[in-house]
Structure formats: structure tokens, C-alpha cells
Amino acid sequence: MRIVGLTGGIASGKSTVSNLFKASGIPVVDADVVARDVLKKGSGGWKRVVAAFGEEILLPSGEVDRPKLGQIVFSSDSKRQLLNKLMAPYISSGIFWEILKQWASGAKVIVVDIPLLFEVKMDKWTKPIVVVWVSQETQLKRLMERDGLSEEDARNRVMAQMPLDSKRSKADVVIDNNGSLDDLHQQFEKVLIEIRRPLTWIEFWRSRQGAFSVLGSVILGLSVCKQLKIGS
């Protein structure tokens, strides 16, 4: 199975690319969706986060007020690192199970959409790595327009993440999203061809079909050995 790593930065257009993969019929494991699930009221992640940040981050329903929590962690490096440390084990296990589900369903190619792909060292498990890149100027402009943030707040959120230039240097494939939506679509079509190329032997053996092939070969080999033993 080919596990494609997709990452970018806030307001880079990564979610748009993720949706394009979905529309093309390629399964996507979304770390943000997993993160929302592990923060649901009463979950292990919810308990640890509430214990660390207090009940003031909760809505009247008891669910985490995500915008409020975001304001807290984006204004403090130490609090952001604490949140990442608390959530990492739950998110990693959640992503693993989602990948396992796709493997069990017979998927040959999947995309793992992880904003912190390099930061949490998940890049070692994905190939190729696709980075959606924009200039910092474009990133700030889009973030302010999208979320109605001041330049200072937008800059704090951008600076809280690994620089996109650093991510670009580690990528196998770079999608430059500084242009129009049409430009993005044209680049995506080229990426799609790369993603859908035939599996390597290693990728094939990691797939469900490859595992069944190995199992079938073992069973056949044992059967032949048994017949030879009986005939001797």
C-alpha cells in the first residue's frame, strides 16, 4: 500500500488539495478529523486537556471550545507544546487505526493529511510527501481574509508552525498555491498521475493483496512439503 503524506501550513490550501484527492476517489485519513474525535467529551484526550487547561475551555455542553483553546495555545509556545504533547499519542493511534481500516478494505493508495507531518515524525512512514506551499505574504493575507484576524494574530498563528519553506525543502512533491484555483487544479492533475503510478514491490507487499499473496505462498509451500513427506 502506498501511503502518501500531505502537509502544508495554515491557509496554504492544504484542505483544498485534500478535498481534490477525495473527489478523485483516493481515501484520505484526515488528522484534523481524528483530533476532533479524540477531543470529544469524556474521551481520554478530553480528560487530559481539561485537566491541563481547566474547565474554562469548555462550552456549556461540556465539549471543548476549540476557538478558545486555539487562542490560548497560539499565544504561548509552552502551552502549544503542552497541547501537542498531550494529544500526540491519541492522534497517532487514531491515524494508525484509520490506516488499518483502509488496508483492510483493500486500498492500494491512501493519503494521510497531517498538518504536523514533520513535527510528529510521521514523514518516515509516508512516501511520497506532498507539501502545499505559499509565500508567507500570501499565507498572512489569506488567513486574515478567511478568519477575520488582525495581522498580529495571523502572524502569531503562522509563526507557531514550522515554516513552509522548511517543509518545502523536505518534500518529494511541491504544489505552489500562490496562484489561482485553475493553477492549483493543473498542478494537482500532475500530482495525481504520480500518486497513481504502479506500486513498487515493497508497496505491493504492504497491501492487503500482497499480504494474501504471501499467505497463499506459505500455505502452498506447506502443502507441497506435506505431500513430499507423505510420498517419501
From Swiss-Prot:
Pathway entry: Cofactor biosynthesis; coenzyme A biosynthesis; CoA from (R)-pantothenate: step 5/5
Enzyme nomenclature, EC number: 2.7.1.24
A GO cellular-component term linked to this record: vacuole
Reactions listed under catalytic activity: 3'-dephospho-CoA + ATP = ADP + CoA + H(+)
Molecular-function GO term, any one: dephospho-CoA kinase activity
Pfam families on file: CoaE
Taxonomic lineage from the root: Eukaryota, Viridiplantae, Streptophyta, Embryophyta, Tracheophyta
Subcellular location: Peroxisome
Any GO BP annotation: coenzyme A biosynthetic process
UniProt organism field: Arabidopsis thaliana
Function: Catalyzes the phosphorylation of the 3'-hydroxyl group of dephosphocoenzyme A to form coenzyme A.
Domain of life of the organism encoding this protein: Eukaryota
Primary residence: other
InterPro entries reported in the protein's UniProt record: Depp_CoAkinase, P-loop_NTPase
Protein family (similarity comment): Belongs to the CoaE family.
Protein's UniProt name: Dephospho-CoA kinase
Residue ranges occupied by any DPCK domain in the UniProt entry: 3-206
